[in-house]
A protein has these predicted regions:
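Conserved core architecture of multi-subunit DNA-directed RNA polymerases
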Residues: 1-351, 359
Length: 362
């Protein structure tokens, strides 16, 4: 080739940055809103806005994907989304939620660090916020966000903001409580009564937490270990992405029946409870019933992400087999990274043995 092969690459990927996704962005990239838990009709065609809607990709020869007009072996598949009736907590970010709640005010959502000049430990012309902001930026520059030093400084800030003497917010003068996490996703705030009375306990649901996190100023996100491009309230899910059908294909058995993937089974549970929750809210059901269904929705979304979460029973198939959901599909020796991407196994392999002719004297 006379032409340099590198010139044929229009862009080079310098790095990949992982972050939180805006619910609006999830809806934009979605090819269809999934509303029904049904998969296939009696005639074998997929339900429109169902979990096997062809807009999310096709897996059968002869069919074209309506989204990109490609055949099954050419279409990469497309994401859909489920609009959740009530917000739920993402199990993967529980520790970040705990840090954010402990480090910020329950009323104004500002970081519980002084912003007045003279509160800097060594420089009287600067504030406590200036001190920790400079330290965090210095550690990011020298060691990076994945370093032990970065984790230590965020823990130090959390410990500083949770001191007993900071029970009153220095910004709005509101009384602060102690944040308690009952695993896996239940948060409570214990507020000590004035004058030595009995402390009050307030349970924080996902909607309360989302409103709390929504008020955190973007210039205070650095104290939580976050950058300004991400928002902490995105940890509380209002929209659930649905993976393409190519990621969770159904299998046709010898009997002619279809066997669905474990992820599809779990998404069916999410959709059914989400629909029941919507119907009960529309019918004006008692708050107790709504809260029970809300907790059940939280359980199904949690086990969809990680079916080995401590403190709750794992989701199972009708046969009693434990479902293999997203975390189990990726992690461990049998997961995608170690088994598939780093694996050395191939479909076919051949060996050869080269030797010298016997007439050669060696």
């Amino acid at each position: 080739m006379s032409r340099n092969s590198t010139t044929m690459i229009p862009k080079r990927i310098a790095s990949i940055r992982f972050g939180l996704m805006d619910p609006t962005e999830i809806r934009k990239m979605s090819s269809v809103e999934v509303k029904t838990a049904d998969t296939y009709k009696d005639d074998g065609h997929a339900y429109r806005q169902g979990l096997m809607d062809p807009h999310m990709g096709v897996i059968e020869p002869g069919l074209l994907c309506p989204t990109d007009n490609c055949k099954y072996d050419e279409s990469p598949g497309h994401f859909g989304h489920i609009q959740l009736e009530l917000p739920v907590i993402h199990i993967g970010f529980v520790n970040l939620i705990k840090t954010a709640l402990k480090a910020t005010c329950n009323s104004c959502s500002k970081i519980l660090l002084h912003d007045a000049d003279g509160t800097h430990p060594s420089n009287p012309g600067l504030s406590e916020q200036d001190y920790y902001r400079a330290r965090v930026r210095d550690i990011i520059t020298k060691h990076g966000v994945g370093s032990t030093e970065f984790s230590k400084i965020i823990k130090e800030i959390e410990k500083k903001t949770s001191e007993a003497k900071r029970t009153i917010c220095m910004h709005c003068k509101s009384q602060q409580g102690k944040i308690v996490l009952d695993k896996p996703t239940t948060f409570k705030e214990n507020i000590a009564a004035q004058g030595g009375g009995k402390a009050t306990e307030r349970k924080l649901n996902a909607r309360d937490i989302r409103e709390w996190l929504q008020g955190i100023p973007k210039e205070h996100l650095i104290f939580l270990g976050m950058n300004k491009e991400n928002r902490p309230e995105w940890i509380i899910l209002k929209v659930l992405p649905v993976p393409p059908i190519t990621v969770r294909p159904s299998i046709t058995l010898d009997s002619g029946d279809r066997s669905e993937d474990d992820l599809t089974h779990k998404l069916v549970d999410v959709l059914r409870i989400n629909q029941r929750l919507r119907e009960n809210r529309d019918a004006g059901a008692p708050q107790l019933i709504v809260e029970d269904l809300w907790e059940l929705l939280q359980y199904h979304v949690t086990t969809y992400f990680d079916n080995q979460t401590s403190g709750i029973p794992p989701a199972r198939h009708r046969s009693g087999r434990t479902l293999k959901t997203l975390t189990q599909r990726l992690k461990g020796k049998e997961g995608r990274f170690r088994s598939n991407l780093s694996g050395k196994r191939v479909n076919s392999v051949s060996y050869t043995h080269l030797t010298l002719p016997t007439s050669y004297a060696v």
